[in-house]
Each structure stands twice: as C-alpha cells, then as structure tokens.
Amino acid sequence: MNLKLRNIPFSPPDMTEKEAQEVREAILSGWITTGPRTKKLEVQISEYVHTEKAVCLNSATAALEMVLHLLDLKPEDEVIVPAYTYTATASVTQHVGCKLVMVDSQKDNVEMDYDKLAEAITEHTKVICPVDLGGIVANYERVFEIVEQKKYLFKPNNALQAKIGRIVISADCAHSFGANQKGKMAGEIADFSSFSFHAVKNFTTAEGGALTWNLPFGNESVPTDADYMLTVPKKEGETWNELLYRLCQLFSLHGQNKDALAKTKLGAWEYDIIGPWYKCNMTDIMAALGLVQMERYKGILERRYEIVRRYDEALKDLPVAVLNHKGSDHCSSHHLYLVRLLGRSREDANKVIEQMAERGIACNVHYKPLPMMTAYKALGFDIKNYPNAYHLFENEVSLPLHTKLTDEDIEYVTSNFVDIIKNL
C-alpha cells in the first residue's frame, strides 16, 4: 500500500489554458451575456445528441422546470420521480405548483421499480422523470411500454399534451451527457432531456445546463389557432420544434420577445413582455468554457472509462457492489463511482469515508433518499414507504472520479480503500 499522503479531491473541474483563453476572448469581445457563443454551443450540443434543437440554460434544474412550464401543468397534475435522486428532480414540481409523486427503487438497483411506477400512474399523471444516475441511461424502453399501457388514463390539458398523446417522459440527464444506450445518445431517447454542466460534472460550463427534446411531430407546423400558450402569438408555418425553442427563450429571459443580441440591430430597441416569466439563461462566458470542453470531451470520456476500469479491477474481490457502466448495448458517461458495502450499515460506510479523508481522499454519498430530507418529510413523504431506496443508501460510498486523477492517484485511492475495507 502507498503510505505517502496525497490530497485527492472528490470532483474538481478539468480546466486547461484553452478554456481560459476562450473565456478571455469572450470577455474582450464585449459580449458576455447570452450571445453568439451560447448559440454556437446550442448547435454543437444538438448535433452531439442528435436532436433538432438544444437550449442552453443556467442549470439542469431550470431545464427540468422548463419542461413542466412548456407542458403548462395545473395544480392537480402529477409528476412521478424516483425517491432515490437529488432534490432538483423533485423540487421543480413545487416551483410550478403541481403534485409530486415518488416511487421506490428496484431492489439493489438505482433505477425506479417499474412495477411500482405502473401502479402509481393515475388519470392525473402528466410526467414521469426517470434519472440517469451516475451517468447510466435508465431503461426508457420499459418506461415507454408503461406509458403506452396506461395511455387510456391520459387526459391532455392543451394542444401540446394532446399532440404527444400520452404521459410525457422527461429525463433527468444531469449525469449522463455523452452516455448512450442501444445506439442512441442520452438527450434523444426521452421526450425531453435535461443536462447539467455544473462544475462537478464531466462536461462543465461552471454553472449551466441544457434542454433537448425529441418529438416525432417536431417538424410539423403548429396551427395558428392551437389551444396552447394563448398569450404567445403563433407564427404562420412555425414548427413545433421552432415554437418550443422560442418558448424556451421567452421563459428564460423574463418573457421578453427580443434577447440582447436581437436588440443590437439598428432601431430594434422595442420589445414586448409576453409573460411574467423567469431569468435562467446561459451567458457567453459560460458557453466559452463549453465550446472548449466539447473539443476535449471525447478524451475526457475515454479517461473516465479507463479510471472506472481500474477501479473495477482493484475492487473485484471485495464484498462490494458497483454500477455497471459499460456493456454490449450501453456505455454510461462514467460520471460517478458508487460502491455499496454489502452487509454493512450507514455507520460502517461513514467510518470508511472518515478513514479515507484521514488519508487525504475525499469521498461522497449518492444519495440520501428524498423522503429522509426535511423538505420532503414536510410534504408527507416517509422513508418507511421506500425501503429499497433506503437499502441503496444505507451502505453507499462514492469514490473520487475525475480526469485530474493520475494513474498514481488511482493506485493510492484503490489501495487505501481496499485496506480500509479489509480492516473494517
């Protein structure tokens, strides 16, 4: 075992001089808010995940909430999320004022229990939010099967919901940018997909996120008299993809019908406020980071694959369970390395985290289930109703996984972890 103390942070951003130079150029260009770099990054993201459009925002949370606004949900409408996730998946329901429904995990699997998901669907269910936890694409085939089976319960409230014709699948892809399943990229599989580009993510714009969608009718024209977003004037010949993109711009910029870039044209000062909406746009400084990260992302992912391979090899003889990041039909983004200490308690797992910290290695936990959190207890959720989610949490430890790790760092992490587990 390597006894020389090292300092191993959990997930620092991987920045180079290239990102610094692009940010400098953005600042000196005089265009630091939403502008040409943001628009360029949107195009690159849509091309990367094979969708017609992408909208850059300031977080995945904003993207997840944007979906609920685009669907124009009502207070009685229900959104189903897993209990085993980060708060953003669920909190957006409270932002828009609809009803939150939680479903337990599968036994020994971080995905939702799909049988329980089917049971949770009612005539009020409008959206299901699967989570690509750790960067592993969820079983969307199963989710689509379930919503087709429950199609008879679906009652649309507007023209967009009616056009979709069933419960909407809004993927929480905060972890899975760059992941794929059965030849499709995260971002093109679900109806709507929300990505996070936060500083701890594989691909980062410091803060930031993006929304993509893939609707079979996206290139069809929207009837000018469509019963949908009645305060927003419809344009003759505008497609659903174009309208949704325009709505995202409105929702992210106070409902203002001209962004700063459009207002730079001579005599184009005048604008209207279509709705009293939000401020969650991406800036060109953030996008500058993203443009360079896109150039580097293939290499970033490949290094993550190698780190996970080395972790798997080092831990293979321990009494632990880890996520399956790569298989014949899928490849995750390799965002998190979750380790469950089989037969151990939360207290045992906490001891491991403390002992790793004493050796300079930062670990984490993904996740404490939402029904254990104060905010969700106050909404009436009880962890006793989500035993599988609790079982996943009770002995979980996340090891550092990032591209600043050297081969020597990986050896240091794994040798210390193995030593601590064997002496626990």
How would you describe each model-predicted region?
Residues 39-43, 51-52, 115, 127-131, ...:
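PLP-dependent aminotransferase class I/II
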Residues 15, 33, 85, 108-109, ...:
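Glycine-/small-residue-rich active-site loops that bind phosphorylated ligands and cofactors
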Residues 1-70, 74, 143, 239, ...:
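Conserved PLP-binding active-site segment in aminotransferase class I/II-type PLP enzymes
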Residues 206-210:
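Glycine-rich phosphate-binding loop of ATP-grasp-fold ATP-dependent ligases
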Residues 56, 81, 102, 211, ...:
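Conserved SAM-binding loop
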Residues 80, 101, 168-170, 194, ...:
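Structural detector of well-ordered beta-strand residues that form the stable sheet scaffold
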Residues 157-205, 236, 269-273, 322:
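Conserved active-site segment immediately N-terminal to the catalytic lysine
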Residues 69-173, 180:
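PLP-dependent aminotransferase-like
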